[in-house]
Amino acid sequence: MEKNIQTSRQIWRFQAGEPVRIDDPIAREQPVTLKINGEEFATLVCTPTYLQEMAIGFLVSEGLIQAYEEVKTIWIDDRQGFIHIELVRPIDRLHQHLQTKRYMGSCCGMSRQGFVFASDAKTAKKVQTRDVKLNAGDCFRLMAELQENARTFQQTGGVHNAALATKDGLLLMREDVGRHNALDKLYGHCLQNGLSLHGKLVVFSGRLSAEIILKVAKIGCELVLSKSAPTDRALQIAEELDITTVGFIRNRSMNVYTVPERIELKS
């Protein structure tokens, strides 16, 4: 298991009507501050694993950089809780103006305000392909595979899981206390390793909010599967960006919300 992902604490568990003293596994949560070109830029609250991937995915998805090649150096100071990033160029004026040491909680991502609206317009583009085709059985199988491999969630109940997949199965999986962070870790891994995202989809454990759909669009995937529900704004954005959303994948049942052409609905 990746180190630092969970801890434990003694608790009282009420079981079969009786209190029992046990050691209970708890998901770890830690603030990590991104320092870009020597200046504090943002603090992310996250599971302290795959931090370089998370930082790279965050920078690209938020429009600070366009590619991993724009990162000159990146290193982690575990003791102080910093990710030091030196870029090949200064941050543009829009991001400099909004560089106010933003604090991003694990549950809801960052404060959106004007910064992200401009960033989203720049980085969340309409999907241009419809190459991913699934049937209901594929959706059930991929979600089952995600849940079977969600070992930290099984032990703690305290993390979200996200995976990059094809029709045939999961390719890469990441977990984090923050839904957005799990996706940034996936994206950062692909960027660092030059992995093609063509024909890939996202399998996700959490709620499909507007911000999650925007993350999926920025990654470049045309379809997202989730065991949870969407919001109305998320579905509006998914339709605008031609992203297929499938939610409530549970007990051999699922809902196809947007762009159903990628899902074979007939049995």
Swiss-Prot record:
Record key words, sorted: Cytoplasm, Molybdenum cofactor biosynthesis
Gene that encodes it: fdhD
GO biological process: Mo-molybdopterin cofactor biosynthetic process
Function: Required for formate dehydrogenase (FDH) activity. Acts as a sulfur carrier protein that transfers sulfur from IscS to the molybdenum cofactor prior to its insertion into FDH.
Cited InterPro entries: Cytidine_deaminase-like, FdhD
Name of the protein: Sulfur carrier protein FdhD
GO cellular component, one term: cytoplasm
NCBIfam families: fdhD_narQ
Organism: Shouchella clausii (strain KSM-K16) (Alkalihalobacillus clausii)
PANTHER family assigned: FORMATE DEHYDROGENASE (PTHR30592), SULFUR CARRIER PROTEIN FDHD (PTHR30592:SF1)
Pfam families registered for this protein in UniProt: FdhD-NarQ
